[in-house]
């Protein structure tokens, strides 16, 4: 029984560690922050990256519009959700959460 519990705990931590999500925005666009971002489940939410203060992150991830949400699996980008021309996020929490779930299920 201990082995099963240990395996379950290990599997859970490995699964959650595989998916990371980052929210990119800028202070000048803080009115359009994605308020539901930190409530995403089954992933590690990296938090908000201000591209005005972190130009290297902007260049590395090719952020062209803010806000942008990127889902990473094992360190590689697997999905991207970007704002429209009015700098507002079009994707809903449900759409982003569905993509996280799809990425987790793709391993099975």
Residue ranges of model-derived segments:
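Sec-dependent N-terminal signal peptides
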Residues: 4-13
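Short, flexible, glycine/charge-rich loop motifs used to bind or transfer phosphoryl groups or to couple energy/partner
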Residues: 11, 36-37, 59-60
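A short beta-strand-turn-helix
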Residues: 14-19, 55
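Local sequence-structure signature of Cys/Sec-based thiol-disulfide redox active-site neighborhoods
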Residues: 17-47
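N-terminal post-signal-peptidase region of extra-cytosolic proteins
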Residues: 51-58
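Structural micro-motif
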Residues: 61-72
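Non-catalytic, surface beta->alpha helical segment in thiol-disulfide oxidoreductase systems
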Residues: 71-108
